[in-house]
Regions:
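Alpha/beta-hydrolase fold nucleophile elbow
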Residues: 131-143
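Alpha/beta-hydrolase active-site loop
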Residues: 111-132
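C-terminal catalytic histidine-bearing segment of alpha/beta-hydrolase fold enzymes
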Residues: 67, 239, 243-291
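Glycine-rich nucleophile elbow surrounding the catalytic serine of serine-hydrolase chemistry
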Residues: 141-151
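The feature captures the conserved acid-bearing segment of alpha/beta-hydrolase catalytic domains
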Residues: 185-247, 251
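Short amphipathic alpha-helix adjacent to the substrate-entry channel of hydrolases
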Residues: 87-103
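Hydrolase active-site cap/lid region
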Residues: 151-205
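N-terminal cap/lid segment of alpha/beta-hydrolase-fold proteins
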Residues: 29-74
Length: 291
């Protein structure tokens, strides 16, 4: 073979390799699959999320968001965030830097109800089966996001690597209901959100006060699978009082033998959420895949 032909073959190989690598880019795959799911490229938007590609699409009337790392980590692990996308995102950014995807499926106004769980079921199928993400996402729930995180996890304990709940609602009677076990709760509550919550669950107020299917009622499966839970608790929280929410999660989960890590901040109210230095949470999430 002449030197000219050898050079031509070498150049062709380089071009083909580059084209193949371009086609395998995680960003390109996510973009294409979201367009398919949404049914039209008009339903897709792309933007920058702290230096990473972020794609959002409306799928059957529901907003999906997927932030994509430059190079996915082995097994394509992912953080599944509930509510308040982009708020106090230090942890999310650190996980993206480590090759994790960060995903979101909007369940606003559903307060972790069965309709919210079913919506998350559909997103999980998309993320795991279509995008090929890990079968066990790491769940992240701030404030009212704790309701969907814990209710979905309780239903599917084998499909969860670990859980991070941040000043999180564990009982909708406490927030937004401002009631607790047939008595006035210690939090502020929200009349408008309480009405919306009752509608989402299809309950009267009397039925809601007797409801026994919240996150605190179904921890056994998670404990049996030893799913690790990281709790951030601002002890002066008068919106989502720890005594009616996070404290009960910690005590009940420990009684069941479940592994739980507490991070307490004694002088803070419901805000701020998140950790300015999320290194301890990052280590916790990374370890959750190795158990």
């Amino acid at each position: 073979m002449s030197a000219v032909w050898k050079l031509a073959f070498a150049l062709a190989f380089i071009v083909a390799s580059a084209t193949s690598a371009l086609g395998d880019r995680p960003q390109k795959n996510v973009e294409q699959e979201l367009v398919k799911a949404a049914g039209s490229r008009d339903n897709l938007t792309s933007s920058d999320f702290h230096g990473f590609a972020l794609y959002a699409a409306e799928v059957d009337g529901v907003i999906y968001r997927v932030a994509v790392p430059e190079q996915p980590a082995a097994g394509k692990p992912w953080v599944w965030r509930a509510r308040f996308w982009g708020h106090q995102s230090e942890f999310d950014v650190q996980m993206l830097k480590r090759g994790w995807h960060v995903c979101y499926c909007d369940v606003g106004g559903l307060f972790g109800s069965d309709a919210a769980v079913e919506r998350w079921d559909r997103f999980y199928k998309f993320a795991h089966e279509t995008l090929g993400l890990h079968r066990q996402p790491f769940l992240e729930g701030m404030s009212r996001g704790g309701l969907i995180v814990m209710r979905w996890a309780a239903r599917y304990p084998l499909q969860v690597s670990g859980i991070y709940v941040d000043n999180a609602v564990m009982d909708f009677r406490s927030w937004p209901g401002a009631t607790y076990e047939d008595r006035k709760g210690s939090g502020k509550g929200s009349a408008a959100s309480w009405k919306q919550c009752l509608e989402a669950y299809g309950l009267t107020e009397a039925e809601a006060l007797r409801f026994q299917h919240g996150p605190l009622n179904h921890l056994e499966g998670l404990a049996e699978q030893r799913v690790p839970i990281f709790t951030l608790i601002n002890e002066a929280d008068d919106v989502v009082p720890p005594a009616e929410n996070s404290d009960l999660l910690v005590s009940r989960y420990r009684e069941l033998g479940g592994p739980v890590t507490e991070r307490r901040r004694p002088d803070l109210g419901h805000h701020p959420h998140g950790l300015a230095d999320p290194s301890s949470l990052v280590r916790f999430a990374l370890a959750s895949l190795e158990r």
